Amino acid sequence: MINKYLLSSLVCILFYTAQAHPSSKLPQYNIINDLSSLIKNIANKDIQDDILSLTGQWGVKLDPDSIGEKHNYFNSGHTTMPIQLPGTLDEAGYGTRTVGSDYGILTRRHKYIGPAWYTREFVIPHNWQGKEITLYLERVLWESKVWIDGRFIDTQEGLGTPHYHRLGTLNPGKHRIAIRINNDMIYNIGDKGHSYGEYTQIIWNGILGKIELQSSPTLSIDRIKVYPHTSDNRLDISFDIQNHSNKTLKGEVSYTLKEIGSKKKIYAYKKEIKGEKGIQHHRETLNIRQAVKHWDDLHPNLYRLEICITQKGQSQLKTVDFGFRNVTASRSKILINNRPVFMRGNLDCLHFPLTGYPSCDIQEWERIFRIYKSYGLNHVRFHSWCPPEAAFTAADRIGIYIQAEVLWIDWWMSVVRKERPEMTTRGLPKGLGHNPSADKFVPEELQRMIEAYGNHPSFTMLCIGNELGNSNFDIMHFCSSIAFL
């Protein structure tokens, strides 16, 4: 929180400056306005004190023979090339330069498939002493392994969702991070779907979107899920309470609900909580007395839930933007808030040919979805891929229904195409139910998608994939264990 002694000093400095030099040529200050602005800037910085951005220049070392772990590429002393992150090896000009053009797919300037090591140093601030730290990588293709100061942390994977690496606590001061990104085919899903392929996306290597360290206090909250009920203005909430100490801790949790458009506060509530050691799953129901506005494609009304946990002067604020909307079906009709909706949509096959990867910028997705609306569309099907969170956020604001998917494996992908070699699918993947590798990946990726984007009202449809022609259709049990949106 803002240091009260620092604020007192700032007041004295500003007052002394104005009084000591009333007629000098020094800039004249409006004490109230400047102090207010200064306090606001400090407060905003204080809110961001739990985030440390790692965007900027990194070093990268290619590892085409996958010898980096054996030869300790995670330690210092290895020669690296400079690269700006977020970004890709293609943009930096690393890999094999393409000569001519590739038939039927995007022609990349440079090609590289395999592990690449990204390294840099960073400094942990003193006020992070004893705090739990998580590395957040917004978008990676496909696997990330992390080392801190030569110590292996863990491995994460996923094509359409962020990678979270739990680093534990780090002492204040300088540290070195090494991230091994492997864009090779980790699970055999082939290379013809848009989540992993060269048709409209490329098989890029790098890190996109946010790259940051996130700190949390000893008693913190995580994995917030909201379940709005349009029938009775009720909001069910679930989240994890994490106690990183070795003893039971008492604290306070407050809930505040605001209408984003008007910024009107419509609900506030707080209660004492007891956090046992480890992780506890917590549920809460907020009964909202006043009427709420529903969300749909014509009226994209949004609300912001703020949950703040406080314990012995340490606090953590988490926010979730969501909408009150209900999705049901009546025979052949889809109902949004009990109203039949005709889905007028577009097929999005990851069309970003200038970069070869999807934008993680909200404004860019708002621009795209406003074009949709100008043509009378209200729906987008992301063919065999899942977009970044920016797309869901923009769709929430504009009023677009999203269908996200995982992959595409069809019968012809398991066959060598001698007459059209370019159509031969890498790995010759068998269909789901006959492909243990893909059978493991799909339900895990579906669950990651729900975890990452399930609070967005625009996320109304979830699909395993496209044209699963050689699959065992009993695989629908994949969906039975997934929580409802």
Model-derived features with residue positions:
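Secreted/periplasmic carbohydrate-active enzymes, especially glycoside hydrolases
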Residues: 1-11, 18-385, 389-394, 398-402, ...
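Substrate-binding/catalytic cleft of secreted carbohydrate-active enzymes
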Residues: 369-372, 379-485
